[in-house]
Amino acid sequence: MIDAKWVYTWKTDEQGWIVKAKSRLVARGFKQREGIDFGEIFAPTLSSSSVRLLSANACELDLDLWHFEVDQAFVQSHLDEDVFLRMPKGCGNLFGKVVRLNKTLYGLKQASRTWHSHLIRCLEKPRF
C-alpha cells in the first residue's frame, strides 16, 4: 500500500500575483519495494546525440520530422500489477480509504515503463 499526497503549483504574473493554481494527486512511490510493489521499471530514453543524428539524417534525406507532446502521459497507461493507494486529506469522503489504481499515477516507480509499453502498443496499431 502506497500513500498519496497533493502537489500544488501556482503560476504568477510579473507582479507576483497568482494567476493560475493547479493541483495533482501523486503517489509517494519512494516507499515502493522492488519485487513486492512493482516488477520491472526500465524505460528506454533517447540520447541527445541520437536526436541530433536522426535530425541530420532527416534533413539530408528531405524528410519531415514530427514532434508531439502527450498531456498527462503517465496517467494514460494501465498498470500490469495491483497497486493500492491510501487517499490523503482533501479527497472528501475518500480520505483515509484505500483504493486500487486502474492506471498509473505520477510518482509510481513503474510509471515510465507502463507509459513506454502503452506508447509502443499505440504505435503498433494499424491506423497509426
Name every feature range the model reports, one short phrase each:
Residues 1-128:
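Long, low-complexity, charge-biased intrinsically disordered regions
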